[in-house]
């Protein structure tokens, strides 16, 4: 199809999305076989954003973790910058270079574990641009109190679709 425009799904931990040999723990989400097994799924563009292995714990959290198992080490707190990269660099590039439906209604974000944490944060921070979230097994225990305070301050969009799997 050379004329169609498509919704976009952004996945965090992108190395885990397509192929098990590239996945962090040797097992991927197998997105391509899942799409092939379900021909009724609407066509979409899947953007799999790899993490920076050494910075994953920092970039996938907007807040510092309440405790660290390594004395003198603090993790987290770079999620705002990561979000700006995704929403101000990656998304505009994808929308410019590919035939996307760039509006909020056709933009989704998915992540699991720490990827779930950054998905829920970015989904709230950019509610005006992200219409659907898939949050799977988020690691909220790392900064639950900070996230709760954050939610309390946000005006939530009641029509944002959020799918949570714990």
Feature map (PLM): residue ranges:
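Non-catalytic cap/lid and distal C-terminal segments of serine-dependent acyl enzymes
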Residues: 1-166
